[in-house]
Every structure is written in C-alpha cells, then in structure tokens.
Amino acid sequence: MNGPLLRRHHPILLAVAFLLFARVSIADSNDLGCQQEPGDRFFWLERGFCDLPVHGPDRANGVVIWNHGISGTRQSWMAPAPPVLRLLQHRGWDVIMLKRHHSAETENTLYRTVQRTLEEVATFKKAGYRKIVLAGQSFGGYVTLEAVDSSPTIDAAIALSPGVRAQGATGRLDPSIIERILQRVTVGRLALVLPKDDALFGYQERGARAEAILSRRSLPYLLVDETSGISGHGGGVTGRFALQYGACLAEFLANTTLPTRRFQCQQTADPWPVVRELLLPPASDSLNLVRDSTALPESVRPLIGIRWGLLEDTIVLVAPVVAEQPGKLRLMYRSTGISGGVFDATTTGGVIRMVLPNKSTITLKPDRDGTLTWSAADGSRSLNTELRIGRED
C-alpha cells in the first residue's frame, strides 16, 4: 500500500490499531447480521440489507463495501445503507457495511478506516468476489477516495458528498483535498455525487472544478453535480437519488467496458421498476392486496391497488391489503425513509387515515390517482404528494 495517505504514518500505528481494536471480518466471523450493537469493537461488518438474499462470491457481480459518515459523538453507525445500494443488491451485488464505533473516533480515524477498508478488500478478493466497489457518504466518501488512492486495484468507487471539515463542526471544507485525489487517483471507474446546497460544506459548488479535473483524465466517470436536481449534503442517500440515478449507476457499474470519459445517464420514462425494486417486498412474500374494490368503503374505492409518490426526497408506497377481520381496513406502507409494514387504517369523510409507529399520520384522498399527506406527530409540519399507480408485474 503505497498511497500518499499511508506514507504519512509510521507502521507502528497499524500495530497499535490491531492491538486496541477487535477485528471482525468475513474471514473469521459469519455474523454479518443487521443492527448490531458495537460493544467493545471499533470496526464491525454488517450486511446492507438483511431482508434480501446474499448472492455470494460465485454468483454476485461483486461486493460493495460501504463506509458511513462521521458526526462527532453521534451514533453515525446506526444510519442504514442508502436506497441506491438496495437497488444494487437487487441487481446482483452484495452490499456490506463497514461500521465504526462513534465513541472511539479520534484524529487518526481516517487512517485506521482506510487501512481497515483495504484489509476487507483483500479479504473479499480472497473469498472469490470478482469485483470490489468502495462506496461512502461524506467522511465515508473521503475514506473511499483515500482508499482507492492508496490501492490502484479497486474496480470502482462511489463517493457521495465526499469530504470532512477541518477542526470538526466549526471548521470549513477544504475542497482542494478531494480535488488533489481526483487528479491522481487510479481506479477502474469513479462515480462522484456533489449535490447542490450542501449546507454542511458551506454551500460550496464543487461540480465544475471536479468536471474540469476528470475531463482531462483517461478514466470512466459518472458525475452527478449541482445541476442534477439532487440537493443537500445527504442528497445521495435519498430515495430521490435512487429513483433518478440508481438505474444509471447500476448500468455504469455493470457495463463490461466503458469509454474513458464522462458517462451519460439516460433518464427512463417509466420509474416504476426502480420503485418496485426499492419498496415492494421480496417476490416470495405474498402481498395479499385488496383486489375487489367492493371490499373498501365506497368513497375510497378509487384507491384500490398500489400507489407511490415522492415526499420531498423520500419515496413512499401504499396499498390496501386484506384484513383478517371483516369490516377492518389495513394499509401496506413502505418508504425509503423508515421501515414499513402493514397498519390499521380508518375511513372518515371520504379519506383514509393511518397512524405510523412514530405517531406521524398518513392521509389518503381519492383525488385523481390519489394524494397522500404526511403529518408530523406534533402537527408542526406536513408534506403532500400526488400519487402514481404502480403495478404488480
């Protein structure tokens, strides 16, 4: 490992890291279960999506190793893998999350995380995975770029809003750090997401400078910049990003050969296949949807079937399902923001209402193809979306 980051540190640091922090990897543990507690570990691995099947090294396109962000003493490791990676899992990739204990974050976290990421790269290669993709958000995106800068054998990198502020929350982003990596990094292909209005990084516009650098290099790259319709520091981890660019990213990674220039996304006229992959239960699960409209109160019968929409950056999906008790109404509700399920609902005044476990309220109205209103538990805000009709195919 001869990257510039690794050359700046004495080898003794690596030895200390091994002694101080327990290591759990695919080579010595089969426990990759989701929502683990860190215990006394600094690093541990989890599957990205425990409700989806693992492909394994023999059948998978490859493995995606995800690094999450950093936020002081907050439990950043609790953040789920982004929806766009769920789409990749559906399309033949195994997604693994490399998690870090927030209580052990130090000024040396970057170095240790890059080292551990590269160790996992070697482990998954030895396990037989044909391709290795590194991915990350914010600090995790920075780790991703430093890792591929330190090891030129990585097949692809996905960096979402990469960077870290100097001196913690009070500091500013130094964009030149990422730009220098872009000038020299050697990787099979690179996907870079730089959303508009990134408040965490001082609203700096980085897309034009990144394009100027990458366009001069012999490198296949996908750049989603400030002109893309994606906004906010976490824009790349939203349902909106998965909906608009997930299929494009999957194609970018799957193509056997790519020209050494910017990859252009072709927007699809039918977003439903992506919504279906993101939010419908696995095919083995019975949806048990209401198929006879007379099973619903007359005023809401137009709402029969699957419907979906966008609440700001979150994709939501709803459908009436068969209730075990006659006269009862139940709704399937799923979103890219929170885990979903099937919940009791009521009809009043020609609308359907449902209370989610977090006490927020969903209201469905049979206007046109349907409208959905989400209301906060304390009534402080609400969001509306016009619904579209989905399909079971």
PLM feature spans:
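Central antiparallel beta-sheet cores of small beta-barrel/beta-sandwich binding domains
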Residues: 288-368, 374-382
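Conserved alpha/beta-hydrolase
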Residues: 88-104
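N-terminal cap/lid segment of alpha/beta-hydrolase-fold proteins
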Residues: 28-58
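Short, surface-exposed "cap/lid" segments of acyl-processing enzymes
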Residues: 57-88
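Gly/Ala-rich beta-loop-alpha elbow adjacent to hydrolase catalytic centers
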Residues: 136-140, 144
